[in-house]
């Protein structure tokens, strides 16, 4: 008999060799019906996996991220099977699950069209209805290569040949289709209830522009049609809110072919950016942070010392200065560490909180670039805190509360993930355990719910990630808290303790916005360009009905500017309805309309973007109203 520990801590005994699917049935027939995959001792596996030793077990459903992943991974295989049935000459490349669904890359001597996608989708529905079992099998290297050669799958042969010696080579078979794959997958094609093919794109083999251009088909999959319909509605809404479209319409930013991935901020975009950064500075000053600034370019040796060279070299830009090798920083932490090292520190100085709005550069593949969301140059709102081990819990709690304050201001709900040690980590087991427990205890102490994301920590320490949920249900990973014992060791950081001896500080890396540019992109989509008054680039649009009101309009404009209200005037010889419609398209919070009545009464006719016509009020009353709205940062 073997002992199986369930997620809730309950221990059950079973015969050795029992399949996970059978355990799911014994736990609950309802769970068995919903089960898609499982985790055994933290590793995601198929439900058909047999258990031969004591293990911890978590049954995964579509509510779990890895459950979704398994279902959508199978969706990619179903797509490939459908394409091969309809177009046997097509060659298969790769087909993974991704955050929002899946894709598969194909080599074909024709171009896929939207009409062909409809035909493929119909074939997918047939395959789902046929309910083929997914059967995993393994082959020795030579047999695996021969199998793929027989099928004329050159890309699969290349993948197998590139696998390290001794690597397990596994395949999945479903009906008449077999694919090279490590898995895991759901038990049968019938589990994938609803599939939709979404779009077509080009993609270089292995992401290398020197390789052949393939055709990529994107799709998504759900266990219920209602969930798929909801997702498709969200996509339609997302198109309307696309920050690239709104950024152009509202004249906030642009991206040019002279600098792909390097955004240009226009005056209105800079207003939003400066407000966000100034608010950030104010709140950090209140919370005891001191702001620093470090150079963009630093000697290559620094990046070797920090470990970024080994883990991040492919994403870095390099230059040569005075015959020396330098790198443009992809992260702010090594520069911040040099600031810490510049002075001797006492335990009385700790915790030391150093903040930086630092510009970083990271090389992203051109195909991955996406407006402000994925760029090559961005401002990271970093802070690095140095503390004793005894101060970890209190400092982490303080950071969590600060992050919570920021996100609530913008109306975001969010969830928290604790990410643990990855495979390519550095440091001792003991340090990782202390660091992970420190983050866990901080979250537990304030009753903050969180998920555990095994193996997704930074290479130097575990982390807490904050995922924002926007108004149409999408999630965005922004804030992060990373506990680090490794950098202080690598850079020989120290402080003088109460005993007069040198001690090693603990370092925490953290961000709130994550990337200022990306956060602005998220806000554009969150508000659909209709920013709250305190954040709007133009807060008031002032317009006259005829030239007779021009002098009064200029007086009103001057009064608004004296009160630091951002105002634009529209004195064009156009109908007032046209001016109002244009201001509404520009999503200005307030329009002040001035006609003869308003001039005579010394008032302004107020129209709100949100509430429509508010009637005529005195200018003083309006100024008081909008100033209060700005002060309290009404969302």
From Swiss-Prot:
Its UniProt entry gives the catalysed reaction(s) as: tRNA(Thr) + L-threonine + ATP = L-threonyl-tRNA(Thr) + AMP + diphosphate + H(+)
Instruction: State the UniProt keywords alphabetically.
Output: Aminoacyl-tRNA synthetase, ATP-binding, Cytoplasm, Ligase, Metal-binding, Nucleotide-binding, Protein biosynthesis, RNA-binding, tRNA-binding, Zinc
This entry's Enzyme Commission designation comes to: 6.1.1.3
Disulfide pairs here are: none
Q: Which GO terms describe its molecular function?
A: ATP binding; catalytic activity, acting on a protein; metal ion binding; threonine-tRNA ligase activity; transferase activity; tRNA binding
- What does the UniProt cofactor note say? Binds 1 zinc ion per subunit.
Which residues of the sequence carry a binding annotation for Zn(2+)? 333, 384, 509
Per the record, the domain of life is Bacteria
Provide the primary localization: cytoplasm
Q: Which InterPro entries match?
A: aa-tRNA-synt_IIb, aa-tRNA-synth_II, aa-tRNA-synth_II/BPL/LPL, Anticodon-bd, Anticodon-bd_dom_sf, Beta-grasp_dom_sf, TGS, TGS-like
The family classification in the record reads:
Belongs to the class-II aminoacyl-tRNA synthetase family.
Q: How does it assemble?
A: Homodimer.
Tell me, in a sentence or two, what this protein's role is: Catalyzes the attachment of threonine to tRNA(Thr) in a two-step reaction: L-threonine is first activated by ATP to form Thr-AMP and then transferred to the acceptor end of tRNA(Thr). Also edits incorrectly charged L-seryl-tRNA(Thr).
HAMAP family on file: Thr_tRNA_synth
What name is this protein filed under?
A: Threonine--tRNA ligase
Q: Could you tell me which species this protein originates from?
A: Clostridium botulinum (strain 657 / Type Ba4)
GN (gene name): thrS
């Amino acid at each position: 008999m073997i002992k199986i520990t369930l997620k809730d801590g309950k221990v059950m005994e079973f015969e050795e060799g029992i399949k996970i699917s059978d355990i799911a049935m014994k736990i609950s027939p309802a769970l068995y019906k919903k089960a898609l995959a499982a985790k055994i001792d933290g590793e995601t596996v198929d439900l058909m996996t047999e258990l031969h030793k004591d293990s911890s077990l978590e049954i995964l459903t579509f509510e779990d991220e890895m459950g979704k992943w398994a279902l959508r991974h199978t969706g990619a295989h179903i797509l490939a099977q459908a394409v091969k049935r309809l177009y046997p000459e097509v060659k298969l490349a790769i087909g993974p699950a991704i955050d929002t669904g899946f894709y598969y890359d194909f080599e074909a001597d024709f171009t896929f069209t939207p009409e062909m996608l409809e035909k493929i989708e119909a074939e997918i529905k047939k395959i789902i209805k046929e309910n083929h079992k997914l059967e995993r099998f393994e082959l020795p290297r030579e047999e695996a290569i021969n199998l793929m050669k027989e099928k004329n799958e050159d890309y699969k042969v290349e993948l197998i040949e590139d696998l390290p010696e001794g690597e397990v080579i596994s395949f999945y078979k479903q009906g008449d289709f077999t694919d090279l794959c490590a898995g895991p997958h759901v038990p049968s094609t019938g589990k994938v209830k609803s599939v939709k093919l979404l779009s077509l794109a080009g993609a270089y083999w292995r992401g290398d522009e020197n390789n052949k251009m393939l055709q990529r088909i994107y799709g998504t999959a759900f266990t219920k049609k209602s969930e798929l319909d909801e997702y498709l509605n969200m996509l339609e809404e997302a198109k309307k809110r696309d920050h690239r479209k709104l950024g152009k319409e509202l004249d906030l930013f642009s991206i040019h072919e002279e600098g792909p991935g390097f955004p240009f901020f226009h005056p209105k975009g800079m207003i939003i950016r400066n407000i966000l950064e100034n608010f950030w500075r104010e709140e950090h000053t209140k919370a005891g942070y001191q702001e620093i600034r470090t150079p963009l370019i630093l000697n290559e040796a620094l990046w070797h010392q920090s470990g970024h060279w080994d883990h991040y070299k492919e994403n870095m830009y390099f230059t040569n200065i005075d015959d020396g090798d330098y790198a443009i920083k992809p992260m702010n932490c090594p520069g911040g560490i040099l600031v810490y090292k510049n002075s001797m520190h006492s335990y009385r100085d700790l915790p030391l909180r150093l903040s930086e709005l630092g510009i970083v550069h990271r090389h992203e593949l051109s195909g991955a670039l996406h407006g402000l969301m994925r760029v090559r140059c961005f401002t990271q709102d970093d802070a690095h805190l140095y503390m004793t081990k005894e101060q970890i819990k209190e400092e982490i709690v303080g950071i969590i509360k600060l992050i919570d304050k920021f996100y609530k201001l913008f109306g975001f709900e969010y969830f928290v993930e604790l990410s643990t040690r990855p495979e390519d980590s550095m440091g001792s087991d003991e340090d990782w355990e202390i660091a992970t427990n420190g983050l866990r205890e901080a979250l537990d102490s304030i009753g903050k719910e969180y998920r555990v994301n095994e193996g997704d920590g930074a290479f130097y320490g575990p982390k807490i990630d904050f995922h924002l949920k926007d108004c149409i249900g999408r999630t965005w990973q922004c804030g992060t808290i990373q506990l680090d014992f490794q950098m202080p060791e690598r850079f020989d950081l120290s402080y003088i303790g109460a005993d007069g001896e040198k001690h090693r500080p603990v370092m925490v890396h953290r961000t709130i916005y994550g990337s200022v540019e990306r956060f602005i992109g998220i806000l554009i989509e969150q508000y659909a360009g209709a920013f709250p008054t305190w954040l709007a680039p133009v807060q008031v649009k002032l317009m006259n009905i005829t030239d007779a009101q021009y002098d009064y309009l200029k007086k009103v404009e001057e009064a608004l500017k004296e009160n630091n209200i951002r105002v634009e005037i529209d004195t064009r010889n156009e109908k007032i309805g046209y001016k109002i419609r244009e201001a509404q398209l520009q999503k200005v919070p307030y329009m002040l309309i001035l006609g003869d009545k308003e001039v005579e009464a010394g008032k302004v006719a107020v129209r709100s973007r949100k509430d429509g016509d508010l009637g005529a009020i005195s200018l003083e009353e309006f100024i008081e109203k909008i100033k209060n709205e700005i002060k309290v940062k009404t969302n």
